[in-house]
Structures are given as C-alpha cells and as structure tokens.
Amino acid sequence: MFSCDVLQPPIAKNCVLLKTLQRVQSNRITRVIRISFKEHPDYNLDFFEKKSYALKVKKILLIWMLMCLCFSCKTPPNVTVTKINYADFYGLVQSHSASSTQLQNSDTTEEQSADEPAEIGYVSVQLDAEIFEPKNEKYYDAILPNNMFSFLAYKNHCEIFFDASDITSFIFYINETKVDSSEICANGFSKIDASAIVKNGRNILYVSNIEKSSQSAALKIRIPYPILTRTNKKIPDVNYKALQLVDELLQSQVANGFPSVQLLVAKDGFIVADHSYGKIYNVDKFSDSGLSDAANVTGKTLYDLASNTKMYATVFAIQRLVFEKKISIHDKISKFFPEFSDEKKARRTGKSEMTIEHLLTHSSGFPAGAAYYAKKIVKNANGKDRKEKVLKEILKTKLINNVGSKVVYSDINFMLLSFIVEKVTGQTFDSFVEDKIYTPLSLKRICFKPLEHGFPLSEIAATEIGLNRSKRNETNNYFVHGHVHDPEAYNSMNEVSGHAGLFGNAESLAVLAQTMINGGGYGNTRIFSETITRNFLGVSQYHPAYALGWRMQNTDAYKWNFSTLASPQTFGHTGWTGTMSLFDVENNLIIIILTNAKHSAYTGGNQFEGDYFLTRNYGAITSIIYSAFSDYDSEYLATLLTELASQKFALINASPRFQNNGAYNDLAAIMQVLQKHSHSSTVKKFLKSEAAMQINNLLRKNSK
C-alpha cells in the first residue's frame, strides 16, 4: 500500500502525522519522511484522515524513528590503548609469550605461571606484518591485499601490538569497525585491547592512508596467537544447564563405581568447564577393599594417555620436523633405514615405497601389532639394546597388505615413527618432544615416565587392576600405577614409544589442541606453521576418517566419539585406558575427557566394568556438551536423559555382553540423575512409565 523513503525534498507541511515526525537528526544528516501511496487513486492529504491507515503509518514511523535513534546513539568501540616500549614489541616474550602464560585468567591481571621464557627460536606470533609501499619488491600489484590481514581471535582476549614510530596518522579498521589511531601514533609503540570489537574466529585488519614524518618510517603490526582463558563469569550463548547435566552424570557415575574422570571444555578461547571426579585409585593393593584415604583426582592429576600419545607426542613431533624441513611426509622409510625392504618371496610387498605418510595414515600394510615384547631376542635384551632389537624386528615384520592398499590401525606405524624422530634428531624421542614442544609451551604436566620426572604417585591415576608384572624391582603386582600400561611400550620400548607411554592432564592436552586450532602456535610461541597444520588436518587419500595421524569427523565417520553435532572439521583421538580428545576447528571447541576406566573389575576379553559406562564411550557426553552451545530448551535435555536410560536398558536386554555390573551401575547412575530432574514433565512421564518400572526391577534384582 505504501513505501517509506528517506529523502531531502520538502513535502506537505500541513500533514498531521508528519508535523511531529518531520525531522530526525542522525549522524548530522537531516532526514525527512515522505509517504507515497502508490496504489491509491487519490494522492492527497485527505487520505490521512482515515484513522485506521493513520495508526498503521504512525506505528511504522515510530519504529523507524526508534531504529534511527539506536543507530545514532551507538556507543563507540571500547578500545584501550597502552603505551609500550621497544622491547615489548620486538621481544614480546617478556610479557606475552606462551612460555610465561600457559592459561590466562580474564578476571585478574595476574599471570597464572611465570616460568622462564622460551628459547628465542620459538618466539613468533600469528601475524607479523609490515605495511610496504609500491616501490618495495614485496608489494603485491593487486594493491588491496597489501593492507588487509586475516587473524584468529576471540572476544575474551585479543591484543594487537604496533610500532608506529614516525607515523603521524593512518586509517585503521578491524572488521567493519573503524578505530581511532591518533593515540597509537602519539605513543610510537602501543598495544590495544581489541577484545570488544573482534569476533570469535577469523577477523580482518585493514590499514590505509599512512602518513609519515620520515621516509624510513614503516608501520609494523604484531598479533599473538589466541590462548585459553579462565573466568568465573558466565559466558553469553552457553547453555549452562547442559553443562550441569554433564556434571550430574559424571558425579553419579563415579558414585556408582566408575573410577575417575577429568573433564575440560573450552569454547571460543574460554574454559567453560574444568572438573575432576573420583580418586586416583579405589582398591587397596593388599585387601581388595576401597580406600577412603586415596588422593582425590584434581586438575593436576596425570593420566596414562595410551593412544593419545600418537597425536600429542608423535604427530606433533613429525609436524615439527616437517616445519624444520628435516623430513617430508613423502620421505621413504628406506631413507632412514636402508635395510628396510621386502623379504624374498614376500606375499605382500611395497616396503621400498613405504613413506612417512603411509605410517601416519595406517596404510603401511603392517599388522595391528606384533607383540615384540614376547620374542626371546627382545626379552633377553636390556635398556638401549632392547630398543635396538625391537627396531630390527619392526623392519623385518611381514606386511599383511600391500603398501597403500588398505587401512589397518597399527601401533607398529607409530613405533617406527618414533624411531625415525630419534634417527633424524639424534635425541631420544621423549627428550625431543619435551625440548621442542612441551617446554616452549610451558607444559609442565605432560611427559613420559612421570615417576622419573619427580611426580609422586598421589598425582597419577592408576590403571589396570590385577595385572601381575614386575621389572627392575618395580612394584606393579596388584595394579599399574605410575608406569605405562601398554605392554609393548612397557616391555619393549623402555616406556617411551610413539604409540603409547605419554602421561598428561586435560589442561596440557587443551593447550596442544588450541595450538592446532590456532594453526601451529600459542601465545608468542610457534611450534609449526599454519600451512603444515592445514596439510596434516586434510582428509587422507586412504580413508575418510583419517587426516595425517589425526582421526577426523568428516562424513560422520567418528560420530560415536565426537558426536553427530561435531562439524566435519573435528579432529582428535582416543586411548585404550579411557582417554578422549577432540578439537572442532569450525566451532572453536575443545573437549578433553581423561579417565582410568580400566581401573575396575575385569569382565573378559579386553573389557573392564569401567568400559560399560557412558563416560568411557564418550559420544553421549560429547553430544550433551555440544548441545550447550545451541539454543536447546530444558525439555530437550530431559528427552536426552530419558533416551539414555531407555536405550541403555535396551542394550542390556539385547546383548549378554552388557549384562555385567559395569552396565548395571551405569544404568543406576542415569536413573539417579533422572530422579533429580523429576520436576520436568518429560522426566516425570518417563518415571511413571512401564519402561522405568522394568529398569527399577532390573536394578533391584542385580543389587542383591
């Protein structure tokens, strides 16, 4: 019926509606409203006397006026400029290196740790830009890309450093927001807090119209990598009811017999959950009784990471060596070990063509394992000689598939990769990852052989119960505690291997995961480049669920672990002892779940009671965590909870494998959480159902 246009020409002055809304002042522009009735045959002022139309027009004009007022009153961006000195800009390691701040606390100005700075070779930032002029050979003839830069940032913490010495003025934008540069120019060396104007994820910085007071002047900009931030404040857009439900489930599972859990969740650079449950062990070595004086698990407790070693030691080491240009993923294994070749009359061949990429993607043709520790030649050897014997045995191992023809998950691949690292660097594998990865990132609670690093048993979670083994006067006769559980790593590789042996806490893995999201760096420390990160996180040509070493979601291939809600760009791994890590690059999300699920009663095969709890099977917990970052209501969460109970009951009825105390106790834990949510109409209805009655009967029967 009508259209509202913003224009300057005068219109009827006696229009009743327009007398009160004739002019709106916004950003020094006088705007006048003209109402044109395009479809009405009589274009005159009498039309406004029709009350119903007048009211509609008045409402629209009022809404328009309020919108204009909102835009005109927009608060300028809150950008704090701080004067710094030459050393602060060119030696950022003094105050902003990851080496001096592993985790930032956004509620205070204090750093959490103040360790020694990293070696100078590691000091690097994600953006180190100098604005060139056309006469410079580095200037792009496309023009605009010279002054536009992409960087990763989060709303909680983003600092940008400037060397504007002898710069009198310049135009400066972050995304669509223009920032006043006058104070930056006045200071010479400055840093700005851009937390209020950056967005979570990729941002664009644009500078232009640089005015200099000397010909030699050049505007320089540096931006550190994002770091993880702790806060006591609630983060917007986080459904804390979902995180509370996870907390209730984990507490209930531990109360019903699950050994222990360490959980860390980080979203957009904020740590939104960091909890620990249970004790480091729950049986006495001599009496089989529970121990009330066993140390509680804390955020500092170390867990046997099992196959997460492959990611956070071996893959990191290979990525670092590729960054240093000491190796290529296309290097053949025979380059490092010339004796590595097909044996005569081999049924499966290709050793001479096998590359590092084949090892990373489990397409080498090696079997899953070979129990080298059981071979007499290995058992009779000691120390360094034992590892040399193992290497010879690996190089002689027969292939079960032609190289590159099939993917078979194999520990041998990563054992061999650790030998390659040692061959190339001249260091032991554990010392290399400590020197080149963990120390530069100030990670003090991740290592091989934790007892030798001075960690007491009270800070390490125990693993398998009832494993009878002893070596070098070590006491592991009742349960494994402080030593790697994996028999190959323990007996063949002196507890240091590329496939198992690493111990760490959730916080350390979260920092390493954030390093991957960041593109290879953390704070002011670069471990490898963004190009290498992208290459290693690309889909393997051999299997859609593999990148280079990393497991990936891709086409929901890993949803049992990561959850269906995870983006295709989600990566991570699991460990046999009960550990899981994931980082979702698209959603800037990190989830670390560390458990000692094997520290429970044996049920047969490779299974223990702890393996039958939801916590150990990951996907249910990760699904609820993902829902914390979507706008799901309470009844949705209640529905998830009832689904967990009904389908766990169905699994128990469907398979004898699930008819054990682990599964029963898990179901009991779920039902106890349901009782806490009995105020929900969905839960209330379920608790009155026939299914709930059958579940309670089953639990009563098996509690006797």
Give residue spans per PLM region:
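Beta-strand-rich recognition domains
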Residues: 78-174, 196-240, 244, 249
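Short, gly/Ser/Thr-rich active-site loops of penicillin-recognizing serine hydrolases
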Residues: 234-239, 288, 518, 531-535, ...
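Short, conserved catalytic-motif segment at the N-terminal edge
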Residues: 236-303, 326, 343, 602-607, ...
